[in-house]
């Protein structure tokens, strides 16, 4: 993830989840990088800029990580992750 995208993601996260100002951007950036490795590895090749499901999953992963509840994220979002993986398995032309 590029720095511009990381900065935008941190800003979105702070606004959407009402993260207090005393929680530093660098800490949120660390959660984003951690989430990129965790969530991104579940569906390699997806782009955070164009894939809105990936973006949503990453922000929610960051929120759960912020509250130290990563295992609950995996339990709660497993069906969304599976659907996301299945949707991106087939390309636009309908071929595998």
Task: Please provide the spans of the model-predicted regions.
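Conserved short "hinge" loops at termini or chain/domain junctions
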Residues: 1-56, 67-69, 87-96
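Active/ligand-binding-proximal structured segments within catalytic/core domains
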Residues: 59
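C-terminal structural segments of small proteins and small subunits
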Residues: 64-86
């Amino acid at each position: 993830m590029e720095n511009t995208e990381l900065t935008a993601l941190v800003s979105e996260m702070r606004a959407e989840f009402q993260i207090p100002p005393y929680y530093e951007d660098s800490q949120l950036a660390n959660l984003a990088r951690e989430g990129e490795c965790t969530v991104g590895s579940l569906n390699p090749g997806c782009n955070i800029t164009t894939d809105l499901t990936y973006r949503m999953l990453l922000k929610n992963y960051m929120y759960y990580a912020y509250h130290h509840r990563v295992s609950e994220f995996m339990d709660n979002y497993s069906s969304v992750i599976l659907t996301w993986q299945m949707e991106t398995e087939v390309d636009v032309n309908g071929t595998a």
